[in-house]
UniProtKB/Swiss-Prot annotation:
N(2)-acetyl-L-ornithine binds at R148, S290. It is found in: Cytoplasm. This is Acetylornithine aminotransferase. Its cofactor is pyridoxal 5'-phosphate. Pyridoxal 5'-phosphate binds at G113, T114, F145, D233, E234, I235, Q236, T291. GO terms for cellular component: cytoplasm. It is an enzyme of class 2 (transferase). One of its GO terms (biological process) is L-arginine biosynthetic process. Belongs to the class-III pyridoxal-phosphate-dependent aminotransferase family. ArgD subfamily. Disulfide bonds: none annotated. Its EC number is 2.6.1.11. Homodimer. It comes from Leptospira interrogans serogroup Icterohaemorrhagiae serovar Lai (strain 56601). Binds 1 pyridoxal phosphate per subunit.
């Protein structure tokens, strides 16, 4: 048996195990990756792929970053986990770094974005209770995505995510994104009952839909006027994805709370809820918790991730590569009628098509490019923040060759 046959057999065995033992909750592509190096992935046959996906905006520093590997090894030699019933040098240092680079307040560390959203939801409920609001309302946006837990689904403005589970949590109302009049009307309709407004600065799962500056500014003004929390879900936009460490930095104001995950741990599971000073005392001892959240290993990796972003000119590379990507994609839009819109910010890019995006993503994969198909007709482009301009252009060449045929 030659190497190709061995690799094919290994991959087939992997598929059979997955199909037999894993719940059928994912529509997987017909490939398994064995290793990666920065912006490149390699499958069982050692075929090379340029990664424009980053595990859904997770591996922002690429694959197998040497400094991340060293921190994992070093911390694993010392301590994985004790619990949050004891002080942790790694968690304390990470919390300090997050606050110094966001806004004054305190941090709750989690294992995932969904758990960070759960914390934000409980924060809003705690706030309602503290104000004796009997029938509180949390505003969210249509087309939003906030996770797969019951609270996350309840906050998510997409029927396809919510369906099949019966009645979800009450007290959540949805408004159209970037509709200033609808936002004002909601605050008027539920005056005295709104305790929070939660927003993704760029709606990711619905196809990279940026919220306008006017809408975001109005959101801040209305929440302040009505003494409601403004919660930003930066799980996907955070950690340098849009060209700044956090997307809110370019807005001229801060939210009252912010959720993080994905790129925070460079692929190691960790999330965070940052709560501003005004609301940080709503959580008291015993009112919230996590067994694994922010354990020694996860916190050490997250700290190193932020340090790397701040010391390696990563954000400068994001802005350079973003200019290249948007220029080329808009040139493609002029040439190929199949493209209806190019949108996004930094290396968080959506390519809206006039045809379904799944076949496009599959064709790209066959040609050696990993992209994400979302919202039925959007190709989501999220390469590592460390990608070289050479591989960026090679990936865009592959994408263009696929679009030419459609």
């Amino acid at each position: 048996m030659n190497d190709a046959d061995i690799h094919k057999e290994l991959f087939q065995h992997t598929k059979e195990l997955a199909d037999h033992y894993l719940l059928n909750t994912y529509a997987r592509y017909d490939v398994a990756f064995r290793y990666g190096v920065n912006e490149l992935l390699f499958d069982f046959d050692n075929k090379q792929y340029i990664d424009f996906h980053c595990g859904v905006a997770v591996t922002n520093l690429g694959h197998a970053d040497p400094d991340i590997i060293e921190v994992v090894r070093s911390q694993a030699d010392k301590l994985f986990h004790t619990s949050n019933l004891f002080y942790s040098e790694e968690a304390s240092k990470l919390a300090e770094l997050l606050i110094l680079n966001s806004f004054p307040g305190k941090v709750f560390l989690t294992n995932s974005g969904t758990e960070a959203i759960e914390g934000a939801f409980k924060l809003a409920r705690k706030y309602a209770y503290s104000k004796s609001i009997v029938d509180p309302i949390i505003l969210s946006l249509e087309k939003s995505f906030h996770g797969r837990s019951v609270s996350g689904m309840s906050l998510t403005g997409q029927d396809k995510i919510r369906k099949g589970y019966g009645e979800l949590l009450k007290g959540i109302e949805f408004i159209e994104p970037n509709n200033d009049e609808a936002l004002v009307a909601a605050f008027e309709r539920y005056q005295g009952r709104i305790v929070a407004l939660i927003e993704e600065p760029i709606l990711g799962e619905s196809g990279i839909i940026p919220l306008s500056r006017n809408f975001l500014t109005l959101s801040r003004e209305l929440t302040e006027e009505n003494e409601a929390l403004l919660i930003f879900d930066e799980i996907q936009t955070g950690m340098g994805r849009t060209g700044t460490l956090f997307a809110f930095e370019t807005m001229g104001f801060s939210p009252d709370a912010m959720t993080l995950a994905k790129g925070l741990g460079s692929g190691f599971p960790i999330g965070a809820l940052i709560v501003g000073e005004k609301y940080q005392d709503l959580f008291t001892q015993g009112s919230h918790g996590s067994t694994f959240g922010g354990n020694h290993l996860a916190a050490a990796v997250a700290y190193e991730t932020i340090r790397i972003i701040q010391t390696r000119e990563i954000l400068n590379n994001v802005n350079i590569c973003s200019d290249i990507a948007f220029t080329r994609l808009r040139e493609m839009q002029e040439k190929y009628p199949v493209i209806s819109e190019v949108r996004g910010k930094g290396l968080h890019i959506g390519l809206e098509l006039k045809v379904p995006s799944k076949p496009i993503a599959e064709a790209c994969l066959s040609a050696g490019l990993v992209v994400n198909a979302t919202a039925d007709n959007v190709v989501r482009i999220m390469p590592p923040l460390t990608i070289s301009t050479d591989f960026l252009n090679q990936g865009l060449d592959i994408l263009e060759s696929v679009l030419k045929q459609n």
